Amino acid sequence: MATASADAIRARHGAGADVALPDDRWRRLEVAFWLIPIVAFFAFPSYRVLGSQILITGLFAVSLDLVLGYAGIVSLGHAAFFGVGAYTAGLLAVHGWHEPISGLFVAAIVASIVGYLVSFLVVRGGDLTRLMVTLGIGLMLWEVANKAAFITGGVDGLSGVTIAPILGVFAFDIRGTTAFVYSLVVVFAVFVVLRRIVHSPFGLSVRGIREGGKRMPAIGAPVAKRLRTMFTIGAAAAGIAGALIAQTTQFVGIDTLGFSRSAELLIMLVLGGAGRLYGGLVGAAVFIVAQDYLSGIDPVYWEFWIGFLLVVIVLFAHGGILGGLDALRARFARGTR
């Protein structure tokens, strides 16, 4: 099946095309990338709270990349699974389950169940159908959380979320030190698993489904089943990100389910580059840092500059920031030959 998937990708781009196939080896740039948050932890201690938000949002963006960038499923309601994970972890803590790591697992399971059920509706239609179904599911869950205020807190949010020290030792502090380290460890661990998935024969087959059009069904690949599986994995990862935000902030707002969060997530993925796995992490970092910096300079019109940045990157860097860097590297390599 991996060979058939590779053939499907090559067929899409031409028999002689140079198509990058998944490679599970860790590269030096990847190692350097993960050293950045470690350096930032010591170099910018006053920004550890912001750093944990970047890491969590980055994982959230990676979860969308699995769905959109790899499986090719257009989604405007991915925040639904983020919110489900956040409310699951938050409600567990409110009702006496304060242990954080087990809360992450429960949130992932609940979000994956919701994602699996939704996947049957999503994979059946085309792009427009998928867009409307995911948007509708997100709006429905937001309204459920709003109406069930006696459980979720409604528009006031879910407060009283108390999280026990991690491993019984590391308590969450106001400076965000524990939150940063906890987020980094969890995000990296989940990323390693997701990276292994997309570089596996299964991940290659999903990419073949996205690239191969009608060829994959013709060779007997279970297209719907594999798309549902990838969608479910993406939902589980989003649920973990939601649980992290609930545990590190000890609060769950109804905006975790909101359309605006899904829209911002899509912007981050476009900025970083869809279908590259690291694109979600890069896009989240650029978006949040730019938002923090620009809102401090111009609290009223900062969104204009975010939009301007997005337009520039889309027009001049095909494939987002990482796509633009790849193009520059390829051009430089040709120039040195």
What are these regions (language model features)?
Residues 2-337:
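Transmembrane alpha-helices and adjacent helix-loop boundaries
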